[in-house]
Amino acid sequence: MLTLDQMVGQEKIKAYFQRARAVSHLSHAYILSGEEGMGKKTLAQAIALLLVCEEGGDSPCLCCHACRQVLAHSHPDVIELVKEKSISVDDIRSKINDTVDIRPFSAPVKIYIIDHAERMNVQAQNALLKTIEEPPSYVIIFLLTTNREVFLDTIQSRCIHLRMQPLPVEVVAQKLKESYPITDMQAREYATYARGNLGRAKNLLEDEAKRIRYQKNVKILKDIGNFTLEQMVKVLAEMKEEDSNFSEFLQFIRDWYRDVLIVLVGADVRKLIFSTEMKTMKEKAEQYSLTKVNQILEAVDLAQDRIQANVKAELAMQMLLMEMKVGEDNG
């Protein structure tokens, strides 16, 4: 668990909480939103650590009984609600509503952290709304989410919304270099691919299945011109088990052809995502016309639209891969 000072980035949000705490003007409910891997839970826990520390300094001491309890996830006044699937009304009632009127055991505040709060169904949101509307003065609720739009308007209007921002690619690359045995170029590629999301970049390096899928995707796009229909069917069937609506692969294809486009038009190659594939990108740029690359990018959007319209995903993807193959055949 990190302190606010140890967290990388999110300077505006960290400064906000430091100021709000200094003048005793913390809100009773916050929505922390951002992509998976942006550090929403880490941030909420760091704030909890700061607020319950017995020393009351600008940074938690990490030594007092309260700090040690938070670090061990056992502080009675820092309650986390984590559910793998949906969050039901019973979950909200038992974890929050039934305990909210019990004063803090030892801390000056009572903090509730709801992870993946977008998993609350409407009934659960309505149950939580009652607490958010009239909370005890000592209560602070954090709703952590990848999509705040799923919340009822009445909940959104009663919470302060703070959005987690991506880190500069250079910062993520440096952090990866410090933690993993990779080259500068690899670090930059993963950081760029993750779009400044440190958690996502780390997950790609630590999760063997994701790393293998990344490498397989690169190979598919490098070799697509030589694929037969049978090979396309095979790779799509394998991929569907990991990514049922192919959303990650579709974004991967966009990123790949974006890089081809950068080389094709002579733009700054430092902006490439797949920087370790520079040689391949130059070869692809020689094979494609600008019109053809744009047609493929439009075909990617069309494939996604078809899948969202309930066209069989494998069929939509086969049509896309055929378009990409024809592009290599004809330029």
Describe every region a protein language model picked out.
Residues 80-82, 143, 161-163:
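Structural signal for conserved beta-strand scaffold positions within catalytic alpha/beta enzyme cores
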Residues 1-49, 66-69, 137-138, 147-252, ...:
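Charged, glycine-rich active-site and insertion segments that engage polyanionic ligands
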Residues 115-121, 126-133, 149:
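Catalytic acidic motif of RecA-like/P-loop NTPases
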